[in-house]
């Protein structure tokens, strides 16, 4: 029936029968077309036709299911056009409506509805929406915590103290997250208990023989392979260079050591050899004929190897068996208590759902699983009778996007497919055993495998939803490509989407960077995409562009700091990258007549000019970047739309409406009340609000308004308000002097608010919100503003949310506000309403995840210099589906907390899995492009970064795995791969790179690397910002004819705030700010602050990036905070403490170099060190906040007006300790000292406030105050 010319591989995927078939379909390989054609061939097979309702087709989304149904329907209809009398076709068209083409959740729901009686669930159950689920979970966990507090449950209290930092909401977050995580396991309770039992080790526990030890060793071997390459490269240089052959022996010994480690299979031997190895010293020979450049190069490479081996040694030292065993034993009670707490929460949550006849989204899969599974006498999980009936029913089970399956879904599909075997637990893990199982009835004809699975593991990007790409990979590695096997795989890697230039570039890049370690698959020639699309010869393809820009300012750090540029830099960098992209788009589009890019239009069958709709800008995440890009593109006149999933609650119209709802629920909230009063809903001016506040500064703003309202209306004040009125005559005078218009305004607002509060009780929340839209006129007002259609759409979404909420079992304004707040501060924030259609001629900005499955003529991948998000690794308890819990070790009695050894292992595992996911996300992004691909990114210090890339080019075929593992951005992967490409030669020359590259790769891919000048883009930005506002105003006024408008504009522009001086006083100051203020007061003019500043060299001219003085101070302060003086008898003790901080990742090895063990020892042995050692009460890094009169800092203010104005001073005291007759205050300084008196004067005011803070907090006298100066290894006393 099909006229399509299928490739041989596609034909195999369509026609292969009687086996489990895994189809690995690369990007653009036409997998959906193949899947649809396979179904059509099945139902129209002349020998063995299968009715379409006998096929189970599982898709990833409802849209995919609908598209598949439509394609099949079109194919059947086309067949009927050719053969109108065909009974087979007519039957299949009829059956299509009841076909089982659906998402996994739709199938599970069908199973539940058909078999509800087997799981004791009410047949009238409904699925609770996200709104109700959030509220029920919060209610359940609040009740559970209250109950456990009430009975003083010891395990629970210990958990709170250990992992909640005295705020049980943090423990609630841990429980909710772990609950969600456990639900991705087929049997959550079993998983939770097994993971806790992993800590229950016996006396015979030997860490060196555990899975943990093997993981550590395997991870380290990846690094060792990199070291081996570096040493082998060095030996090659030694043998091919003049006069440095005496280096050969020590390098050969090092290489033998690395090779020996790589052969080790025993962790004990591996650990012992690394700890014992002593690097041989390099001979100190001088040879005039020696190749100095080669000599220096191999020394640097060896130093890098030595440094990393020392770091591994430090790590391995911590994995001592007895210490590790004690950790496991100590953590077991807490982890068991945590698992039990999650189970208790789940039971309470389940009870609440059952009370309301509800199930949630997670329940759908788990209830289906419980219907389809049974246990045999051996405890193995086997198909239930119901599952066996499904096996009889379905002739074939076809699964789309198989790489995104999770373990629950895999078990479900195995129950309804004809697979031999059973599931069982082994070492806490659920695994499938492909063995014969004994069933009561023989399953005649059901022994023929019937699973069809299609997907691309390189596009598995949903691990955050607990997708498990290993499910696909295990089959991919096990299945054979040979015909006739029961488990077979077919590879579809011919790409029918992209130009050859895009394909070749993607292949080159991923051959260089993707591996089993990072990406979970070796990207070999066999895995590479093959060109399948034809674009003719009329228009030649273009190279892939990489546009780079150095984000460092070429001015001194001091000047940046003075002007707060460091705070604005991040935003400016996004703006500048957005501007760069705008320039590229303008060039691509041209004037739409000539000069622009030509793209092939498949519908027209010819080339045409590029349009804005043909371009997509992809980003890893759009929340912060997209709005800035939209603004930059709009400035250049480029129509643009950003498809974001956040920012909804930050829009002005939604913030205003939520504030209004908050004050209707409770008007005693100043911030939302002022937000409403300043909005068009109430239209109060700043002056009016100040006049209201003058009634009483010690009560809420609403209470001030209520007092005015009651006194103006001659109503008697009740005792509550009377209590707050110290002088009634004074209040009466304020109200009497108040503008009559303002008093009426207040009364009108109070009366409206009371009416709204009353109305909110009697109608549903959705009706009430729409009533407010109309009553206040705010809906119409929002529509009249710029982007009014968008604003009104956002307000309609709030109304729809309220409508959903009204259908739940929760009622009332208070609960609705709580629900909205929960959404706002969780991942439930939404993007603004979508008001653009798919065919609008605009550039689209979207996340890479949103782009999956789509394609565009031009793709611009931006933000490649942005760091990967590794924030989850900082949580105090980590979760891994296979390895279990990775908690901090917290001993509340000894007040000790640090990452446990098992946490460090899990942390590294999650980090590698996250990097693998990022690798696949990058692959998805680059394979969306049909004709043109552009990559943009910012680099911190271009010259140094590119030099680092060059140092990683020892292997022309692969970027070293250790380098890929340490990557923090996409550019950290792309850069080292491209710098050795033949097309990067001119780029290196532009940067005046002197390093010679012996491994230039002559690959057929085409690249164009551009270095953009940030200064030029910044200059344009500054020039725009410097357009005189007054000129714009003048021009506007010239165009106004009606004098009334002129007068109003002049009046508004000449407005002067009554308390202008007060507005410049911050509410909080740090002690450092106070110090700066006093320095400013002492200067005659500000020129003194600038005249000594010198512009430092730009970073690309510096040989090596140095740690700044401020960073150095921070590092030394951090070490002093953790210094244990009792274990600091010599320099070796101090070095050991430094290494411990490196090991615990408080500082890096590079940062540790600024800590002088000699200087620290001098402090320890000095008078102050001895006094600290003798004290029984030593406190370090103590934060404080104290209130002081503003006049104490801002002496220029009017003393009468500002006598009651207060400031909060904040700071952190480095160290204080107690002696018999009082406290001793100590502050560390790392400044360079020229003049002792100058230092004393500089810090005198700072120490004064530290002293005052200590006096107030402790109530004890500070008898001595010292500055310890590390630059001179001495202290000075402050009087």
From Swiss-Prot:
Record has Nucleotide-binding as a keyword: yes
Requisite cofactors: Mg(2+)
Source species, domain of life: Bacteria
Catalytic activity: Couples ATP hydrolysis with the unwinding of duplex DNA by translocating in the 3'-5' direction; ATP + H2O = ADP + phosphate + H(+)
InterPro entries recorded: AddA, DNA_helicase_UvrD-like_C, DNA_helicase_UvrD/REP, P-loop_NTPase, PDDEXK-like_dom_sf, PDDEXK_AddAB-type, Restrct_endonuc-II-like, UvrD-like_ATP-bd
SUPFAM superfamilies linked to this entry: P-loop containing nucleoside triphosphate hydrolases (SSF52540), Restriction endonuclease-like (SSF52980)
Claim: DNA repair is one of the keywords in the record: yes
Listed GO MF terms: 3'-5' DNA helicase activity; 3'-5' exonuclease activity; ATP binding; ATP hydrolysis activity; double-stranded DNA binding
GO biological process: one example: double-strand break repair via homologous recombination
E.C. code: 3.1.-.-, 5.6.2.4
Residues noted as binding ATP in the record, renumbered to the chain: 25-32
Alphabetized UniProt keyword annotations: ATP-binding, DNA damage, DNA repair, DNA-binding, Exonuclease, Helicase, Hydrolase, Isomerase, Nuclease, Nucleotide-binding
Subunit structure: Heterodimer of AddA and AddB/RexB.
Family: Belongs to the helicase family. AddA subfamily.
PANTHER family xref list: ATP-DEPENDENT HELICASE_NUCLEASE SUBUNIT A, UVRD / RECB / PCRA DNA HELICASE FAMILY MEMBER
Record protein name field: ATP-dependent helicase/nuclease subunit A
């Amino acid at each position: 029936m099909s006229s399509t010319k299928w490739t041989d591989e596609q034909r195999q995927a369509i026609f292969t029968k009687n086996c489990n078939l895994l189809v690995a379909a690369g990007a653009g390989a036409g997998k959906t077309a193949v899947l649809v054609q396979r179904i059509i061939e099945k139902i129209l097979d002349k020998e063995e036709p299968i009715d379409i309702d006998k096929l189970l087709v599982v898709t990833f989304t409802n849209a995919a299911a609908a598209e598949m149904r439509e394609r099949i329907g079109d194919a059947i209809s086309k067949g009927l056009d050719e053969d109108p009398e065909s009974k087979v076709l007519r039957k299949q068209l009829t059956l299509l409506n009841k076909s089982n083409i659906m998402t996994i959740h739709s199938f599970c729901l069908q199973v539940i509805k058909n078999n509800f009686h087997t799981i004791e669930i009410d047949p009238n159950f409904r699925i609770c929406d996200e709104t109700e689920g959030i509220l029920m979970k919060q209610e359940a966990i609040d009740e559970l915590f209250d109950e456990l507090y009430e009975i003083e449950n010891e395990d629970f209290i210990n958990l709170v103290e250990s992992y909640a930092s005295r705020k049980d909401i943090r423990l609630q977050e841990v429980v909710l997250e772990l609950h969600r995580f456990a639900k991705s396991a087929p049997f959550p309770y079993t998983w939770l208990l097994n993971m806790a039992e992993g800590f229950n080790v016996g006396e015979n526990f030997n860490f060196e023989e555990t899975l943990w030890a093997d993981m550590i060793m395997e991870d380290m071997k990846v690094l060792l392979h990199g070291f081996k390459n570096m040493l082998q490269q060095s030996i090659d240089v030694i043998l091919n260079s003049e006069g440095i052959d005496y280096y050969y022996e020590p390098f050969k010994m090092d290489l033998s050591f690395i090779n020996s480690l790589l052969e080790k299979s025993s962790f004990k031997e591996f650990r012992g050899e690394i700890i014992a190895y002593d690097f041989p010293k390099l001979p100190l020979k001088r040879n005039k004929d020696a190749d100095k450049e080669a000599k220096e190069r191999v020394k640097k490479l060896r130093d890098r190897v030595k440094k990393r081996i020392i770091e591994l040694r430090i790590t391995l030292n911590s994995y001592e068996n007895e210490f590790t065993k004690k950790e496991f034993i100590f953590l077991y009670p807490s982890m068991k208590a945590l698992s039990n707490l999650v189970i208790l929460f789940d039971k309470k949550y389940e009870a609440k759902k059952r009370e309301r006849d509800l199930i949630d989204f997670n329940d759908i899969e788990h209830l289906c699983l419980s219907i389809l599974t049974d246990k045999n006498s051996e405890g193995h999980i086997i198909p239930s009778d119901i599952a066996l009936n499904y096996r009889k029913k379905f002739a074939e089970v076809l699964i789309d996007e198989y790489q995104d399956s999770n373990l629950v879904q895999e078990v479900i599909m195995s129950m309804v497919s004809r697979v031999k075997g059973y599931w069982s637990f082994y070492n806490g893990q659920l695994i499938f055993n492909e063995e014969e199982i004994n069933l009561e009835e023989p399953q005649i004809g059901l022994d023929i495998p019937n699973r069809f699975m299609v997907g691309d593991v390189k596009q598995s990007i949903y691990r955050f939803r607990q997708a498990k790409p290993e499910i696909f990979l295990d089959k991919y590695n096990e299945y054979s490509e040979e015909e006739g096997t029961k488990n077979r795989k077919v590879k579809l890697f011919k790409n029918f989407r992209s130009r050859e230039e895009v394909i070749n570039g993607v292949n080159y890049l991923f051959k260089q960077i993707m591996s089993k370690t990072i990406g979970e698959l070796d990207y070999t020639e066999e895995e590479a995409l093959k060109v399948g699309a034809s674009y003719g010869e009329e228009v030649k393809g273009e190279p892939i562009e990489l546009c780079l820009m150095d984000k460092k300012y070429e001015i001194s750090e001091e000047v940046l700091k003075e002007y707060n540029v460091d705070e604005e830099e991040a935003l400016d960098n996004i703006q500048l990258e957005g501007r760069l992209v705008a320039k590229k788009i303008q060039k691509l589009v041209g004037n739409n007549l000539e000069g622009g890019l030509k793209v092939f239009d498949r519908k027209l069958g010819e080339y045409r000019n590029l349009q804005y709709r043909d371009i997509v800008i992809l980003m890893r995440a759009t929340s912060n970047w997209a709005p800035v890009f939209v603004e930059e593109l709009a400035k250049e006149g480029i129509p643009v739309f950003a498809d974001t999933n956040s920012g909804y609650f930050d829009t002005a119209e939604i913030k205003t409406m939520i504030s209004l709802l908050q004050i209707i629920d409770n008007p005693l909230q100043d911030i939302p009340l002022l937000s409403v009063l300043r909005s068009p809903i109430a239209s109060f001016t700043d002056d009016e609000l100040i006049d209201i506040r003058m009634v009483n500064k010690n009560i809420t703003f609403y209470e001030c308004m209520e007092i005015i309202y009651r006194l103006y209306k001659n109503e008697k004040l009740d005792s509550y308000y009377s209590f707050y009125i110290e002088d009634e005559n004074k209040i009466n005078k304020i109200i009497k002097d108040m503008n009559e218009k303002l008093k009426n305004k207040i009364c009108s607002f109070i009366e409206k608010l009371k009416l709204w509060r009353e109305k909110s009780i009697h109608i549903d929340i959705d009706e009430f919100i729409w009533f407010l839209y109309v009553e206040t006129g705010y809906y119409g007002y929002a529509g009249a503003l710029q982007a009014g259609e968008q604003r009104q759409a956002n307000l309609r979404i709030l109304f729809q949310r309220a409508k959903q909420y009204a259908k739940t079992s929760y009622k009332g304004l208070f609960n609705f506000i709580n629900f909205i707040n929960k959404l706002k501060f969780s991942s439930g924030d939404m993007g603004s309403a979508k008001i653009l259609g798919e065919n609008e001629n605009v550039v689209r900005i979207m996340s890479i995840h949103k782009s999956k499955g789509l394609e565009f003529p031009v793709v611009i991948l931006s933000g490649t210099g942005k760091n990967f998000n590794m924030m989850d690794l900082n949580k105090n308890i980590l979760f891994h589906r296979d390895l279990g819990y990775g908690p901090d070790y917290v001993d509340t009695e000894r007040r000790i907390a640090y990452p446990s050894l098992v946490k460090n292992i899990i942390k590294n595992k999650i980090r590698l899995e996250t990097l693998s996911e990022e690798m696949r996300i990058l692959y998805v992004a680059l394979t969306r492009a049909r004709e043109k691909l552009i990559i943009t990114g910012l680099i911190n210090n271009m010259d140094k970064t590119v030099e680092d890339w060059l140092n990683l080019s020892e292997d022309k075929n692969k970027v070293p795995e250790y380098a890929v593992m340490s990557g923090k951005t996409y550019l950290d992967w792309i850069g080292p791969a491209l710098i050795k490409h033949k097309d990067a030669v001119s780029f290196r020359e532009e940067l005046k790179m002197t390093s010679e590259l012996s491994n230039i790769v002559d690959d057929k891919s085409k690249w164009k690397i551009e270095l953009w000048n940030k200064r030029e883009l910044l200059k344009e930005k500054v020039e725009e910002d410097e357009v005189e506002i007054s000129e714009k105003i003048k021009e506007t006024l010239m165009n106004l004819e009606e004098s009334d408008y002129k007068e109003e504009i002049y009046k508004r522009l000449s407005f002067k705030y009554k308390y202008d001086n007060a507005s410049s006083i911050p509410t909080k100051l740090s002690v450092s700010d106070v110090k700066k203020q006093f320095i400013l007061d002492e200067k005659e003019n500000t020129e003194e602050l600038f005249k000594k500043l010198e512009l430092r060299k730009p970073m690309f001219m510096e040989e090596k990036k140095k740690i700044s003085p401020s960073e150095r101070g921070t590092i030394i302060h951090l070490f002093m905070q953790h210094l244990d003086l009792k274990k600091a008898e010599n320099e070796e003790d101090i070095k050991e403490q430094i290494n411990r901080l490196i090991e615990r990742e408080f500082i890096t090895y590079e940062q540790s170099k600024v800590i002088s063990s000699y200087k620290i020892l001098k402090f320890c042995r000095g008078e102050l060190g001895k006094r600290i050692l003798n004290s029984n009460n030593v406190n370090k890094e103590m934060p404080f906040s104290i209130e002081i009169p503003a006049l104490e800092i801002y002496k220029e203010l009017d003393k009468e007006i500002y006598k009651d104005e207060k400031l909060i001073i904040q700071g952190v005291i480095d160290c204080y300790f107690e002696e018999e007759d009082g406290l001793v205050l100590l502050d560390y300084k790392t400044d360079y000292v020229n003049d002792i008196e100058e230092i004393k004067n500089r810090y005198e005011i700072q120490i004064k406030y530290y002293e005052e803070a200590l006096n107030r907090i402790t109530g004890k006298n500070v008898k001595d105050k010292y500055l310890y100066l590390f630059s001179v290894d001495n202290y000075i006393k402050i009087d």
